[in-house]
Structure formats: structure tokens, C-alpha cells
Amino acid sequence: MPLFSFEGKTPNVHPTAFIAPTAVLIGDVTVEARASIWYNAVLRGDLNPIVVREGANVQDCSVVHVTARAGVEIGRGATVGHNCTIHAARLGDEALVGNGSTVLDGARIGTRAMVAGGALVTPETEVPEGMLAMGTPAKVKGPLAGTPAEFWVKANPEGYQKLAQRHLASVAEVARGV
């Protein structure tokens, strides 16, 4: 797994966390127990810290970056879907950011809230606890409870923790055939 120090700051990864071999962590990045960082994800904590809390997951091809003014915190059991950008924002516990979404500077996604796939959460936007936001720019549409999307917020934390442990135990690079 590519881990790089930056100006004396080095990534700190818990032994039970899964970091895919093609993920890249740079600088002041903390990945807590049972969290997972998936293939081709990049977490660049060069100007401020990035903290990925226990059991959270940052999926394939996502980018997490900071600014000189703010870092990133991804709450316990939160999900950053495939191909997302999280920039100097905060995600609450068990929040879910759907595939292909962008969450910009100073945005706050509440506990068990969901940002639908493809959404653009503009700077300083707040998605309150338990709410569903969608669109470009993202707007809060109402409570997540009782919607089909609620399943993913509930299922993703445990599902990705189990899948990460399987990858941690069995992923191995293979030689290319000649």
C-alpha cells in the first residue's frame, strides 16, 4: 500500500483497517479500526488532517483532500461511494455519499444522512441528520426514513467492513503470464 510522508507527517493506519494495494495515503491521514480505503482512492492530507473513523469506507477511485483552512472527517461507519470527491468537508456517523458525488469545502453531512449519487454539495451546505439530499446543486428532499435508499445507509457499514476483511485476508498480486 503506498503510504507517503509529507513535511514530516505520516499516515497512521490501524492494523485492522484495509488499505487496498493501489490506494494512496499522503501526509496527515488517520485510518481507524475496521475502516477501509479501496482501490485507486487517494487521501491527501498535506495542508490539514484527514480522519477516517472506525468502520468507515472510502470506495474505489474517490479523492479526499483538504484546504489550508479545514481538514476532512469521515464519521464512524460512513460511506464515501465510488468515484467521489470529498474536499475539506465533514461526514457524520453512518452518513452515505453516493457514487459520483462531490462534497465541497465546509459542507456538513449529518449522521445517517445520504447524498444521492451524482450530487454536488456546494460549499458550506448542511445536510441535516437523517435527511436525503440530491441534485446539482444538492438540495434536501426530506427524511431518508422509509425510502428505498435507507437500506444502503443501514447495510453499507457492516457489509463493507466484512468485505474489507475478506480482501485483507486474501488479495494477492499475481505474476503476469508471458
Show which residues each predicted segment covers:
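Glycine-rich hexapeptide-repeat left-handed beta-helix
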Residues: 1-12, 46-54, 60-62, 66, ...
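N-terminal segments that cap or nucleate solenoid repeat domains
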Residues: 1-37
